[in-house]
Curated annotation (Swiss-Prot):
It comes from the Bacteria. It comes from Escherichia coli (strain K12). This is Uncharacterized tRNA/rRNA methyltransferase YfiF. Signal peptide: none annotated. One of its GO terms (molecular function) is RNA methyltransferase activity. Belongs to the class IV-like SAM-binding methyltransferase superfamily. RNA methyltransferase TrmH family. Residues 18-27, 42-68, 76-86 have a biased composition (Basic and acidic residues). Its EC number is 2.1.1.-. CDD domains: SpoU-like_rRNA-MTase (cd18095). PANTHER family: 23S RRNA (GUANOSINE-2'-O-)-METHYLTRANSFERASE RLMB, TRNA_RRNA METHYLTRANSFERASE. Residues 1-98 are annotated as: Disordered. One of its GO terms (biological process) is methylation. GO terms for cellular component: cytosol.
Length: 345
């Protein structure tokens, strides 16, 4: 039906009132392209939208069951997440957290240009990944070619990114992620030692900068074995950087404890040399044996009773007496230098 009325302006206004019968007879508007009713029954005829329960009661298409968007409800209390299957895509596959922890425990980061150059020349197979800043890459051309040929990942990054990757601002423009070395036993060491062999044994010394300085002195004076409680102490980034390449010329030796280690060396014909500011003989007036184990970190009096032997050689480094003594790293250089002078020079 329709009605019309005249407004004050004289214009005719027409109002259309749609009947319930016409609810399904909406016509298509040829001008706008819109219009046209939805197929189905009108609400007047009892038509209504299907309720949610009705939808759930309808059988689902089989394609829905195979859909990747389908959600699966987990029973209450079943909180164990399913292992994600990413089709073997690298970097996406499930990684066992225990495997990841073990892998990280076996790796360490080495930085410093001299340290990384020496490590590449000595054991390139230990390198897992590398980071460089652009300015050092010309000096690492050989390493870059080797890593590319052996599918080792490397990244050329800026200073901020390298600081983050190495964990220090003292990275020297390069950082390697490497596999740690394992220590050798005393028995393995003495079986291949020569007639002249000096071994450095450290008791309760873990400062990485001291360790780095001592490894540098060892490399300079031909001392190849260093006894430590944990071989990883010689693999820390700070120690290797401080050694300036010297870490690649020494091998960690490990044992149950200092008592057993020294006993094993004594039985193999080595003389144990300790320091003692009270009972020691002046170093530069003492003959040092060709095969010896130099114990540092504790003076003779500070070692466990079971580790001391009356036949051990005790020495001291004479000086002015203006200070209590030398830093352990400096003392190592003096002692090893005298052994080199007497036995190698």
């Amino acid at each position: 039906m329709n009605d019309e009325m005249k407004g004050k302006s004289g214009k005719v206004k027409v109002m259309y009132v749609r009947s319930d019968d016409d609810s399904d007879k909406r016509t298509h508007n040829p001008r706008t392209g819109k219009g046209g009713g939805r197929p189905g029954k009108s609400r007047a005829d009892g038509g209504r939208r299907p309720a949610r329960d009705d939808k759930q009661s309808q059988p689902r298409d089989r394609k829905w069951e195979d859909s990747p968007w389908r959600t699966v409800s987990r029973a209450p209390g079943d909180e164990t997440p399913e292992k994600a299957d990413h089709g073997g895509i690298s970097g996406k596959s499930f990684i066992d957290p225990e495997v990841l922890r073990r892998q990280r425990a076996e790796e360490t980061r080495v930085y410093g240009e001299n340290a990384c150059q020496a490590l590449f020349q000595s054991r390139p197979e230990a390198i897992v990944r590398a980071w460089f800043i652009q300015s050092v890459t010309p000096r690492f051309k050989e390493a870059l070619r080797w890593m590319a040929a052996n599918r080792k990942a490397y990244h050329v990054v800026d200073e901020a990114e390298l600081t983050k990757a190495s964990g220090t601002e003292h990275h020297g423009g390069v950082c390697f992620l490497i596999k740690k070395r394992n220590g050798t036993t005393v028995q393995q060491w003495v079986s291949q030692a020569g007639a002249q062999d000096c071994v450095l044994a450290l008791e309760n010394e873990s400062n990485p900068h001291n360790l780095g300085g001592m490894m540098r002195s060892c490399a300079h004076f031909g001392v190849k074995g260093v006894v430590v409680q944990d071989a990883a102490l010689l693999e820390s980034g700070a120690a290797i950087r401080t050694a300036e390449g010297g870490a690649e010329h020494v091998q960690p030796i490990t044992g149950d404890n200092i008592v057993n280690v020294l006993d094993d060396f004594r039985q193999a014909g080595y003389t144990v040399v300790t320091t003692s500011s009270e009972q020691g003989k002046p170093l530069f007036k003492t003959s040092l044996p060709a095969k010896m184990v130099l114990v540092l970190g504790q003076e003779y009096e500070g070692l466990p009773d079971a580790a001391r032997d009356p036949n051990d050689l005790r020495v001291k480094i004479d000086g002015t007496g203006n200070v209590a003594g030398l830093n352990i790293s400096v003392a190592t250089g003096v002692l090893l230098g005298e052994w080199w002078r007497q036995n190698k020079a």
